Amino acid sequence: MNLHEYQAKELFARRGLPVPKGYVCRSAGEAEKATTELGGDLWVAKCQVHAGGRGKSGGVKLCNNPQDVSAFAEQWLGKNLVTYQTDLQGQPVHHILVEAATDIAQELYLGAVIDRSSSRVVFMASTEGGVEIEKVAEKTPHLIHKVTIDPLTGPQPFQGRELAFQLGLTGKKVSQFSQIFMNLAKLFLECDLALLEINPLVITKKEELICLDAKLTVDGNALYRQPELRQIHDVTQEDAREAHAAQFELNYVALEGNIGCMVNGAGLAMGTMDMVKLYGAEPANFLDVGGGATKERVTEAFKIILSDEKVKAILVNIFGGIVRCDLIADGIIAAVAEVGMQIPVVVRLEGNNAKPGAKKLSDSGLNIIAANSLTHAAKQIAAAVKEK
């Protein structure tokens, strides 16, 4: 679950981290009023969306008069911002963050992720702030410095100082950086984060460190113990189908093809999509109904797939282990009957109660194409689409 920049900065401020003073605005009038509250003669207006690359797409603007701030808000509020990290529709802008401009002397990068290979939180810092860290890692990896957090001892001040020295910081900037590091590490652990990025972490001409930008991603599997963060989740930034699927514990990701896929198990789902592509078709989605699929969830999965107008056929591939194939068959029959399916449906059932499940589908009288293997199913679905 992603947070907006302004939400991340509110969490930062509560923990004593240095952030620019700013106001979240929902109208052009509020944006102009924010300049009066902030004072000064230079402000930064930022569209709040769950995507990077805002600046290159016109979603961030440096303004030298209140009218420019107001015009920027008028231009973007209620519109969609398209960046290299969004799809072609972009993401809706409902908030504008207006901040006093910062007098920047140097830009740094500071971030943290969970390193799967070591099962530890790893902090990364670089002098190459303000640019995409992926490009730095590709072209100049020696400029990225890392420290690993031991889960038993937690973050240590010496680790913050170590990073500061590697960045070439001196004097009071070392202690400032170390304190920021410690507070961020505690935030990462307390809020069950999966990703934290400050890009850039700037040094002002007065030698003060400020978190100029903020990006936080919360581990979705830990939201049950983060009720406060769950409440501020902005579902408008997600694909509507994906958000709806999450309510039914379905793992759904929209894609660009026209073959709807419903599978149990993430690995099998990816393998199914590969087979669909191998035989000349394109998957419209990734959808994992999970090991505890019920008739109701299967019915809902069909509805979600069919809400995509691009879908011309549906492939159901179920390997029954925990899940029973006959229950999946009940869900398929109920969904086809309820929705009034007008497109081809290819079903492959294997494993737990596969034969009773196949018999239910056969006896239903519905136009469902049976497949006896994944290869057969992929060929059938590709042929069905070509015939339409």
Curated annotation (Swiss-Prot):
Binding of substrate, residues? 264, 321-323
EC number annotated for this UniProt entry: 6.2.1.5
Zinc is among the record's keywords = no
Q: Which SUPFAM superfamilies match?
A: Glutathione synthetase ATP-binding domain-like, Succinyl-CoA synthetase domains
Q: Which UniProt keywords are present, listed alphabetically?
A: ATP-binding, Ligase, Magnesium, Metal-binding, Nucleotide-binding, Tricarboxylic acid cycle
Obligatory cofactor(s): Mg(2+)
Q: What domain of life?
A: Bacteria
Fetch the InterPro entries from UniProt.
Answer: ATP-grasp (IPR011761), ATP-grasp_succ-CoA_synth-type (IPR013650), ATP_grasp_subdomain_1 (IPR013815), Succ-CoA_synthase_bsu_CS (IPR017866), SUCC_ACL_C (IPR005811), Succ_CoA_ligase-like_bsu (IPR005809), Succinyl-CoA_synth-like (IPR016102)
Task: Specify the pathway.
Answer: Carbohydrate metabolism; tricarboxylic acid cycle; succinate from succinyl-CoA (ligase route): step 1/1
Give binding positions for ATP.
46, 53-55, 99, 102, 107
Query: Which residues are involved in binding Mg(2+)?
Result: 199, 213
**Quaternary state and interactors:** Heterotetramer of two alpha and two beta subunits.
Please name the PANTHER family in this protein's record: SUCCINATE--COA LIGASE [GDP-FORMING] SUBUNIT BETA, MITOCHONDRIAL (PTHR11815:SF10), SUCCINYL-COA SYNTHETASE BETA CHAIN (PTHR11815)
Q: Which HAMAP family match?
A: Succ_CoA_beta (MF_00558)
Indicate what this protein is called per its UniProt record. Succinate--CoA ligase [ADP-forming] subunit beta
Q: Which organism is it from?
A: Hamiltonella defensa subsp. Acyrthosiphon pisum (strain 5AT)
Per the UniProt record, the lineage of the source organism begins with: Bacteria, Pseudomonadati, Pseudomonadota, Gammaproteobacteria, Enterobacterales
